[in-house]
Design a protein with these regions (language model features):
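N-terminal, intrinsically disordered, basic low-complexity segments enriched in Arg/Pro/Ser/Thr
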Residues: 11-13
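C-terminal motif of bacterial Sec signal peptides marking the signal peptidase cleavage site
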Residues: 15-19
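N-terminal leader/targeting pre-sequences
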Residues: 21-163
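Bacterial N-terminal signal peptides that target proteins for export
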Residues: 1-9
Length: 163
């Protein structure tokens, strides 16, 4: 009798624990208002600057008007696997090594993408609108500071693609 009472108690306890009702929530598949796909962009070519390096790619400037931000995305090919590659936007055309306007996240050589996030965010709400008249270029450096690749942007080059 002792064994059957114990078995009954275990069964009742198990039923009590596993019979808790849980709500299964359906996933929300709608984007929040103002969220979703970025559709306005300008893309510029990044080319190798040295015969020893065949690093190339694109820099894309995405407009996010609801947040008054510009997202910068860098995608490179043939990057050295084990290196972090610094990225800077400099004033002037390629060859006019003037002052650095700003630096983004480094590119991870293993992926060819920015290391910290897919996008570098520029919070200046006028940056995207002034991009076509911006006198600047982008440089990609190796770990020793040597320029591997560069590309004119803004007034120094026509976008290779835009929307």
């Amino acid at each position: 009798m002792k064994i059957s009472l114990r078995n009954i108690f275990i069964i009742l306890l198990s039923v009590g624990l596993f019979s808790c009702e849980q709500d299964r929530l359906e996933p929300e598949l709608e984007a929040a208002e103002g969220g979703g796909t970025l559709t306005s962009y300008m893309a510029y070519t990044i080319s190798s600057v040295d015969d020893d390096s065949d690093v190339y790619g694109r820099v894309v400037f995405w407009n996010e008007p609801t947040l008054s931000q510009t997202f910068i995305q860098v995608s490179l090919y043939n990057t050295p696997d084990s290196e972090m590659l610094p990225v800077s936007i400099l004033n002037g055309a390629i060859g006019d090594e003037s002052s650095v306007s700003f630096s983004t996240y480094d590119v991870d050589g293993s992926t060819g993408e920015l290391s910290d996030s897919k996008f570098y965010v520029v919070t200046d709400d006028s940056f995207y609108d002034s991009l076509m008249t911006l006198d600047a270029h982008i440089n990609i450096y190796d770990s020793t500071g040597t320029i591997l690749a560069a590309g004119d942007i803004g007034s120094n080059a026509d976008p290779v693609e835009s929307n």
